[in-house]
């Protein structure tokens, strides 16, 4: 099925099977569709409602066309979420990644610059002095050496450029907003994945199952966060051994002090970086608590602890002994060395 036929098919309220969706996505990602065709298709798909099969097929095409980051790690975890929750908080999942890495889980962090927030993961890490423009081999070196590496989405998903204009002109969420966390270039099989709307919690968990993920938690809080929240209950769909169970996480249950969402908000990347550093240095407050909560969940799905409660305790210890701060310094140094070696290689050529 080509994209012209799919627009009519989807506009009439019909779903695409995986074979049909694969054909259309290949056409888009290979630059064989016009901006107006892409925009029409994405809009029709959104109005109909994207299905699990459609999202799975689209993610598989993106995975096939992305770069491949090959590491020596047996377990890789990602904390990339959909973003777009509109809450303007500091970079919770990115900060959590350093706590997770300090516990011994290799983190292949996938991310991008901000679209709707004050600071995207790439914006924060760049402000923190980390080189985000590494090629796949250099990212793999960072992960193997330091347990953490960052994959800047535009560097690894070159084919996405064919949909960029249509997406920009549309200016609304489409299936592509869901695909980023589903297309980790390192093939991470363990994920803590926040979504911008609770309607996607269970479907995205089902997509991860189809894509071969081993363990994952897909989350969305009642206050709108695509994270596990301190200020409201959070809906969770947990994937483990091919089975999905849905439940609610309440911060009070784990002895964490509830806070207002406004306590976590920032206006720019400088403010986000300041909070990032304060958390890694162990300064008490709601920012540290929400990082501990989310990192604890990742330690649980990364098989380091047997429960979320144990994960939270371990995350607290890691921050207290400054090992998460050390991970940040290690990645900063490793990424800069990779950048220097890349420049030397180019000069020698």
Model-identified regions with their sequence ranges:
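Glycine-rich anion-binding loops and their surrounding alpha/beta cores
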Residues: 9, 64-67, 89, 104, ...
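Short glycine-rich or small-residue beta-strand-to-loop segments that form or flank ligand, phosphate
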Residues: 11, 42-46, 78-83, 298
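N-terminal glycine-rich anion-binding loops that anchor highly charged ligand groups
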Residues: 1, 10-56, 64-71, 290-291
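Active-site cofactor/substrate anionic-group-binding motifs, chiefly glycine-
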Residues: 49-111
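Acidic, glycine-rich active-site loops and adjacent beta-strand->loop/helix elements
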Residues: 81-86, 111-117, 156, 222-223
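Helix N-cap / loop-to-helix initiation motif
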Residues: 17, 34-35, 51, 93, ...
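A glycine-rich phosphate/pyrophosphate-binding beta-strand-loop-alpha-helix module
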Residues: 42, 90-146
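N-terminal basic/disordered segments at the start of proteins
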Residues: 1-14, 79-85
